[in-house]
Amino acid sequence: MAAAHKVFELSHVFKDVSKIGDDESVCSPNEDYFGVPWKIVLRHKDEKMGVFLSCEKPSNNDAHCIVNVVYSVKLMSSSGVCYIKSDSKLFGEITEHGWVNFVNWNTMVDAFLIDDSIIIEVLVKTIFMSGLPKKSPKNFDESNKEFSDGIVVVKHQNFHILKKFLAFHCEYLEKLFFGDFKEAGKAEVTLKAISSTDFHYLLAVLYEDYAIDDDNVGGILRLASYLQVPIVIRKCEQFLIEGSGKPMEIRLDIAEKECLQNLKKHCLSKVGTADQIEAARAILPSDIPKRALKKFDESNKEFSDVIFVVEHNKFYVLKQILASHSSHFKKIFVENVDKREFTLADIDSNDFQNLVEVMYGVSFIDDLTVEGVLHLAHMYDRPFPMQKCVEFLIDLSEKSPKEKLKIAKAYQLKNLEKAALARINLPESIRAALSCDMAQMEVEVLKALMQKALFHLSDTKVHTETFF
């Protein structure tokens, strides 16, 4: 799978352009992407019109931020006249990149100014990001007590956890909590010789609350290997293949030390010799088989406290997992404290299987499952799976922009809508998007598509070059 580059689009109508004096600048409103404010800067100087992309350092972040992007700036008029320039730049100490002389000021006035306004669009694709602000991982202190049944102590720090959930993912912890260890049955157990920070991150990743990054992947992977938590090892490997900015040589070293064969194959394909690549292929299948479905049938009874019946199939699950992510299910459990079995009507059992897998953190959403998971997540008020579906659709899905726009409209997903529109730039993709029932489109979506269509109908393309 290709690396998950982030793509977004900034667009702004600059008004009262004639009032912008020499050596003056005006800016579009800040728009937040990845915790960083972005904006378009328009500058008038020496009869030249400068256009710049600004990536400001967040005010609450002391880290050294680096963002490498390719970007395309488009100046367009309502008649379809268009002028485009593209570049690749690194934002860090320098927070603004662009062109002092994007176009001659008088040319802009004659060709692009309509009602004293101009339209500027900037399409941005990130190549690498580092040092950006990160949300804090989920707390496992007393505030998580409602959704816990035990405490794990690491370096004098208490983590309130759900024992059956951890046992579900980790055979070692299953034996520790429920096996022949002396700690079995105790409300509090202590883990020695590990980092409390790494354990915190490991829990957060298991609970699907925290993103792995280049700063924490080493500690998480070492601990996941030590405790043998397969799903976290898999997620670390996937990140190192798809999202890491670490040099290939370092990733290859990690692959060797942790026996991550898929990562090793990926790294050798990028930096290895012909003999090394051939050797890697010899020990690895050319196609990774589709993962087996995680079973929530009676074999999972030991790690469950409630049953859901869907299309005559029984799913043995934990109340706390469902309740912690869904106000709908939390209400059901509160109103039916002693009830052990519930029936869900009019939903597909395969969709429910996929949804539960996402909730348990054992499934990666794909193009085959995303719509079913999204439908149930919306139906049962589950923000977390919805967020995961949107992230997949924006970053990794191979669905067409037209399909994504349809999904965005059905579930009112504005971020997905904006990302899909940013991908629609070629004539064929515009035609495909406009081929659906335009009466069902949001006005702003239709307007954006028509503007893009006007550009491609124009015979006056002064300059076009793009990395996209």
Swiss-Prot record:
Domain (MATH) ranges: 7-124
Signal peptide stretch: none
Q: Where is the BTB domain?
A: 148-215, 304-368
Q: Which UniProt keywords apply?
A: Repeat
Top-rank taxon = Eukaryota
User: InterPro entries attached here?
Assistant: BTB-MATH_domain_protein (IPR052664), BTB/POZ_dom (IPR000210), MATH/TRAF_dom (IPR002083), SKP1/BTB/POZ_sf (IPR011333), TRAF-like (IPR008974)
* Keyword presence, Repeat: yes
Instruction: Report the SMART domains cross-referenced here.
Output: BTB, MATH
What Pfam families does the record point to? Answer: BTB, MATH
What is the name of the protein in this document?
BTB and MATH domain-containing protein 45
Which gene is annotated as encoding this protein in its UniProt record? bath-45
